[in-house]
Regions:
Chain B
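P-loop (Walker A) phosphate-binding loop of NTP-binding proteins
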Residues: 16
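Conserved catalytic-core segment of NTP-binding enzymes
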Residues: 2-4, 19, 23-27, 34-35, ...
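NTP-binding/hydrolysis catalytic cores, primarily Walker-type P-loop NTPases
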Residues: 270-300
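N-terminal phosphate/diphosphate-binding loop that engages ATP/GTP or pyrophosphate donors
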Residues: 30-90
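ATP-hydrolysis module of ASCE/P-loop NTPase motor domains
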Residues: 80-115
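Flexible beta-alpha connector loops of hexameric P-loop NTPases
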Residues: 67-76, 94-103, 150-158
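Short, surface-exposed amphipathic charged segments that create phosphate/polyanion-binding patches used
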Residues: 73-81, 223-230, 289-298
Length: 369, 300
């Protein structure tokens, strides 16, 4: 199975995984491969390495997809290959900008949008708060899903845990959608009466804990949002529908080390429980088994290959045999947990993965070329 | 390692995802415990040990969860009936968990509490050192700023007061140290340098006390030796699969070691004596024995 097979019939590919496993590079390599297959592809990256961005021909942060130039594409194509038949577009997510644009879109008037953007709570929310990257990444995906692309490849923000990508946007949406909070802030709200709690003592207790200013800031913020909270809620539901749709595919990216594999197994389970569509996994940087049948190996001899070099080589192979064994065991664990779902293996490569040559090499592994 | 690091009360360990923050945090904890300091390694994932559990003599572990941190806070901080009312109110829980930054503040509050000699948790013993296995750099830097941000936003009231106290602790360089973990790869090094710059800005600038270069690949072959291996590979006929793949593995490792040397050089130029290096462990898994080997490298 190759990455092309995994993505058959899908319009959205979301690369998820623990930090440091190569999500961005994988997303870029998939974009290249699908563009070679004639698709119009947009890759949404989050904070890529500068040289990776340069390899894609992206010189600066831009919050809209930019078409990769012919010159950059030439570097991403092997000399013996025909030019790309599809189109490759790429962008780097700017969370703050995406958030501002969302407010612009949903505000009843430009004045209201400007007021919201000046609000202290909003400024915190849109830049400093954990989860704003996740929230805006999905927002951007939703926006681009309306555009005329055959495939969107989303790289997800760095997080300790892959599940953060599923949880964080919901937390922010719930906040923006008001819900419990609004009931709380509207002193005579129906919710209070239903709960049988007098509003006054609860608000008094809340003031005691939060300080009055925080409460009044929040009240001001929700006052500004007004009817937009309903829009946020409706939007959050549509985004959930999009993520669950059978046009979408979550692609798990992992390395073959213990913790990322554990995380991958667990994340697969989480996706299953939430009814999220799953395409398979990519295991990066796999150490291939090294045959050490005859030790020492039947190496060249002579002055160019002194005995101490042979000894070093053997130590190197012994160490690698440990890693190869570890990787094989971990991949087996993954296979058991996946019960037949596709797993693509990308070996540890000698080339630097952050430049055009590296991207091309990874793309070849993923697409069986 | 300089004994200075271990004289702090709170060590924040952060760095890019996948560089081995947890491993390094535990190794630091083991090293401190071995030096006789009662130490706890805490993360804020809320998914591990929910109670303070002893991992090795003098070394404890805790996973801080914002919900229980909040319950604890209300229990201790809010007087009588108000606390009762708030604890029972699902609305309040929803409010607290949905308010941006509140989860982080509650976690920071708990970490701060762990580092106090006078613990507010009933019957809890004091720790000499709290090592925080913090989230990845971007989020890690944001979390360090949360108390200050809250203190500025809330201004008055118990939360503001608590946030001010925590913020003061964090900016006290005698009390708090921030340590970055990196590998000798381009992105982690970039992120370490960005973290240094991000910490240095804002109302409460912080400095990286140490940078730990984790999992440094060995420099096994000289350039001349690598050429000899490449030449041997070129001469070896294709069917000799074993020999060819063995030679290729060696060349791949050499290329990686060369790339790492260049990245290690960037860290060394930026951090000089504050840079500490831990070797790559060719082991099936990193368990207590492996952690002890790393701890020995970090011992004061």
């Amino acid at each position: 199975m190759s990455a092309a097979g995994l993505l058959e019939g899908r319009r959205i590919c979301i690369c998820v995984g623990a930090g440091g496993v190569g999500k961005t590079t994988t997303a870029a390599a998939i974009g290249i491969g699908m563009a070679k297959r004639g698709k119009r592809v947009a890759v949404v990256t989050i904070d890529p390495a500068r040289r990776l961005a340069n390899a894609l021909g992206l010189e600066q942060l831009d919050n809209e997809p930019v078409r990769i130039s012919a010159a950059a594409l030439e570097r991403l194509t092997a000399p013996d290959e025909p030019p790309l038949s599809g189109e490759l577009w790429a962008m780097m997510l700017d969370p703050k900008q995406t958030f501002d644009e969302l407010i612009d879109r949903l505000s009843p008037s430009p004045q209201r949008a400007a007021e919201i953007k000046r609000n202290g709570v909003y400024q915190q929310l849109s830049s400093a708060v954990a989860g704003s990257q996740e929230f805006t990444a999905i927002e951007k995906l939703y926006e681009l899903a309306e555009a005329d692309f055959d495939l969107l490849v989303l790289d997800t923000p760095p997080a300790h845990s892959a599940a953060e990508f599923l949880n964080a946007p919901g937390r922010l949406s719930a906040f923006l959608g008001g819900g419990a909070l609004q009931v709380l802030l509207r002193p005579a709200g129906l919710g209070m009466r239903l709960l049988g709690v007098g509003a006054a003592p609860l608000l008094k207790a809340l003031r005691l804990v939060t300080g009055v200013d925080l409460l009044s800031d929040l009240t001001a913020f929700f006052g500004l949002l007004g009817g937009m909270t309903e829009e946020f809620n409706a939007r959050a539901l549509r985004v959930q529908d999009l993520l669950r749709s059978d046009q979408t595919a979550f692609l798990l990216v992992t390395s073959a080390q213990d913790r990322p594999i554990e995380e991958a197994v667990w994340f697969r389970q989480t996706l299953r429980e939430r009814g999220m569509p799953f395409a398979g996994a990519v295991v990066n940087r796999v150490n291939a088994p090294v045959p050490r049948g005859e030790v020492p190996l039947d190496l060249p001899t002579g002055p160019a290959f002194p005995p101490d070099l042979a000894a070093r080589l053997d130590a190197c192979l012994a160490d690698h045999a440990v890693l190869a064994q570890r990787d094989a065991t971990n991949i087996e664990r993954l296979r058991t947990a996946f019960a037949g779902e596709p797993i693509l293996l990308v070996p540890e490569l000698a080339v630097d993965i952050h430049d055009a040559e590296g991207l091309l090499a990874i793309h070849r592994e993923l697409f069986d070329e | 390692m300089s004994p200075e690091l271990f004289s702090h009360r709170l060590i924040f360990v952060t760095g890019k995802g996948g560089v081995g923050k947890t491993t390094v945090a535990l190794a630091l904890g083991l090293a401190a415990a071995a030096a006789g300091r009662r130490t706890i390694v805490a993360d804020i994932q809320g998914s591990g040990e929910q109670q303070e559990a002893e991992l090795a003599p003098g070394l404890f572990r805790l996973s801080v969860d914002p919900q229980s941190a909040m319950d604890e806070y209300l229990l201790v901080k809010v007087p009588g009936p108000a606390a009762q009312l708030l604890r029972q109110s699902r609305l309040f829980a929803a409010f607290a968990m949905a308010t941006p930054g509140m989860r982080e503040l509650l976690c920071m509050g708990k970490l701060w509490e762990l580092a106090q000699f006078e613990r507010r948790t009933p019957d809890a013993d004091a720790y000499d050192l709290v090592v925080v296995d913090a989230p990845a750099s971007g989020h890690g830097a944001a979390i360090l700023r949360t108390p200050r941000t809250f203190a500025d936003i809330a201004q008055v009231g118990p939360i503001a007061h608590q946030a001010q106290t925590i913020a003061a602790t964090l900016r006290d360089p005698e009390f708090t140290a921030v340590v970055a973990v990196s590998t000798a790869e381009e992105m982690p090094v970039n992120e370490t340098l960005e973290l240094r710059d991000a910490l240095a800005t804002g109302p409460d600038p912080l400095e990286l006390q140490a940078v730990i270069l984790n999992a440094r690949y060995p420099d096994r072959f000289t350039t001349a030796q690598a050429s000899a291996i490449a030449a041997a590979l070129a001469r070896t006929p294709a069917p000799a699969d074993g020999v060819r793949s063995a030679l290729s593995v060696a060349l791949t490792e050499h290329a990686r070691a060369r790339r790492e040397a260049a990245q290690a050089q960037r860290l060394s130029a930026a951090f000089g004596p504050r840079l500490l290096t831990l070797p790559y462990l060719f082991e099936p898994a990193i368990e207590l024995p492996q952690l002890r080997r790393l701890a020995a490298e970090l011992s004061p």
